[in-house]
Amino acid sequence: MKTLIARHKAGEHIGICSVCSAHPLVIEAALAFDRNSTRKVLIEATSNQVNQFGGYTCMTPADFREFVFAIADRVGFARERIILGGDHLGPNCWQQENADAAMEKSVELVKAYVRAGFSKIHLDASMSCAGDPIPLAPETVAERAAVLCFAAESVATDCQREQLSYVIGTEVPVPGGEASAIQSVHITHVEDAANTLRTHQKAFIARGLAEALTRVIAIVVQPGVEFDHSNIIHYQPQEAQPLAQWIENTRMVYEAHSTDYQTRTAYWELVRDHFAILKVGPALTFALREAIFALAQIEQELIAPENRSGCLAVIEEVMLDEPQYWKKYYRPGFNDSLLDIRYSLSDRIRYYWPHSRIKNSVETMMVNLEGMEIPLGMISQYLPKQFERIQSGELSAIPHQLIMDKIYDVLRAYRYGCAE
């Protein structure tokens, strides 16, 4: 990461896409997409997804590392070209506890990530815990971030410190996405970004972490990009120019969250304006969902009723029976809920792919289609971009490859923006 940031600060138009997903097909796609390039791939886990207690993926940081490395080995992607990151590392998962208890767990969380070899660490202590004022004072946020940084430094080896980098600040919704419709978004003021940096510098130095400050590579700010279930707020470069100009006087770049669904031109403009780390998650699993839905429609027409997977019906049944991952995010009416379950841009389906019933139904669908010759006309109907690539000889009409290429479409836009 440090080399990439140095190149950007030297005037090169270069950025990196941060893949925030634990889905094996998304990770496979991210690695396979850059297998034949010289680029490194940044894959990040969030604190609620992966933590010392397992998170909702039932993986510790060490488990997640091995999970990613196993996929890399299978794909033929060199492990040393993978950068592992930890996102929103702090009290996010334990906000219902008092600050002392939550921070104690947060310290162990950060240590677990660093011990597992994660080298990009987002120190995010911005969330209020039980008994805390809402919002927290910037000084309190910075002091808690310094505690987390001290924890990281205490377990990092000398070799790890050479690679270790920190991201500070937050200007994003709670990890997982917006819970309500958005109409506009507040762009971070330069004064607030400067205050984030100033308070963190003061807190780090007070804890004897002056050297660790040199490892802070980025600040999270809100450049004016966001999405909810059916709306996308697109990047307006002119609105972010004060931020773009301010960061030029520092050693750092910005990290932009929720950049999903922006245009490829917007990604290029974001990187130009020093938002050099672009995080993406739901857009990748949304593309995966689109591909699986398309293949399910194809299966319905090609496979006898008694042998079909019933994939779409299974997904719907499971999500309606177990609504805990979408209920507070989606509209309450039954028909509206169904539409959101299937097509929401926030893609809450991503939490359900590991469910045994859904996983089994998708596997059945894939087995059903693997041995079939899918008519080109059907691919044109349901996966038109992939049809074009089949026609030009770039792609084969194999279900797994069709899914990969659908996810590549998202990665292609980021590659354009992060041009190396």
Curated annotation (Swiss-Prot):
The pathway to which it is assigned is: Carbohydrate metabolism; D-tagatose 6-phosphate degradation; D-glyceraldehyde 3-phosphate and glycerone phosphate from D-tagatose 6-phosphate: step 2/2
Sum up the protein's function in the record's words: Component of the tagatose-1,6-bisphosphate aldolase GatYZ that is required for full activity and stability of the Y subunit. Could have a chaperone-like function for the proper and stable folding of GatY. When expressed alone, GatZ does not show any aldolase activity. Is involved in the catabolism of galactitol.
Give me the gene this protein comes from: gatZ
GO terms classed as biological process? D-tagatose 6-phosphate catabolic process; galactitol metabolic process; phosphoenolpyruvate-dependent sugar phosphotransferase system
Question: Know the name of this protein?
Answer: D-tagatose-1,6-bisphosphate aldolase subunit GatZ
Instruction: Give the PANTHER family listed for this entry.
Output: D-TAGATOSE-1,6-BISPHOSPHATE ALDOLASE SUBUNIT GATZ, N-ACETYLGALACTOSAMINE PERMEASE II COMPONENT-RELATED
State the family it belongs to: Belongs to the GatZ/KbaZ family. GatZ subfamily.
Q: Which domain of life is it from?
A: Bacteria
Kinase among keywords = no
